[in-house]
Amino acid sequence: MKTKKIKWKAGLIVLLPVLVLIAILIHGAVRSSETAKKTSMRIGVLLYRGDDTFISTLRASLEECAKEYEKENGIKVTLDILDAKGNQNTQNSQAERLISLGCDVLCVNIVDRSVASIIIDKAETADIPLVFFNREPVEEDLNRWEKIYYVGADAKKSAVLQGQILVDAYNRNPESLDRNGDGLVSYVMLEGESSHQDSLIRTEWSVQTLKDGGVPLKKLTGGIANWERSQAAALMDQWLKGYSGEIELVLCNNDDMALGAIDSIERNGILPGSIKVVGIDGTPAGKEALRNGKLFGTVECIREDYAREIFDLAEGLIMGTLNNHEKYYWCPQSALVN
């Protein structure tokens, strides 16, 4: 009797690993079959403002990624892109609409980072993964669910690179920035949104990098231009009148505001380059101004790489091929100088 029990146990010990292996193979086969059956995917894209220059270029790059993927893989990609026009309530309704349309994943450029939980709750209930981009929700919200990711450009790095452009210029020739020779570089600051984390960080660290690099600074004034060229130009018009002949440097949180400052400088009959203007983003218009000698420097986050990461994340989540991906992805950046 004991011999039979021993044989039975021995047989079970031998059989268990085989059964486990069979189960794993069956599970893998089922998953592979499910993936193989996927002949299309639907990606919802929610934009905070479609007329934002950087966002519009990113949108175009996303559309190119989708076309390339369709061509290479024979899988139809539908991009449902909606513009909230700066209204969070509108974006919340748009999220509901895309969920009801059966989107496989939502890529969200959130309007108000402090209330991302509303869209997160809707997506989690429907079990639709989220890829936030460009406008970073608060950390607590990003950590609420394992199917949430963020793609962006490190704001501190952007600012440090921007500041270093000017530190290098000052070290080569102090008079390139200190035009009046008073021993101080007198600057004005054009900021994005007052509540946007990138704006706050860029403002702080561009100035701090200049100070750390030994550039003597004098702040004349600063203001919020909400990332917009026209608002920046209007502020610059006021400052050129109020600080006539004093402004030597314009620090801008993005290229559009830098271009607005340049518009004002030209409109007021000031020679291009006599006031140094620096931006961030490396937009096509910004790089054109750089080539023309109107913009002194910018920091580029290559939008094609940015869009590719958003698309690849979305595709991996849909196809079940995303393995051990970090919750945050920071796009590489580089300084561009006139």
Regions found by a protein language model. Give the residues of each.
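Short beta-strand elements in bilobed, periplasmic/extracellular small-molecule ligand-binding domains
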Residues: 68-84, 186-189, 211-229
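Hydrophobic alpha-helical
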Residues: 96, 108-125, 130, 206, ...
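Short, solvent-exposed amphipathic alpha-helices that sit
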Residues: 54-70, 158-162, 197-216, 231, ...
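Short, low-complexity disordered leader/linker segments with a strong preference
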Residues: 1-42, 121-126
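Extracytoplasmic "Venus flytrap"
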Residues: 44-65, 69, 80-92, 101-103, ...
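Hydrophobic alpha-helical segments within soluble ligand-binding/sensing domains
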Residues: 91, 150-182, 232, 283-286, ...
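Flexible loop/hinge segments that line or gate small-molecule binding clefts
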Residues: 119-157, 178, 182-183, 283-291, ...
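Hinge/cleft segment of the Venus flytrap/periplasmic-binding protein
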Residues: 9, 13-14, 24-29, 183-194, ...
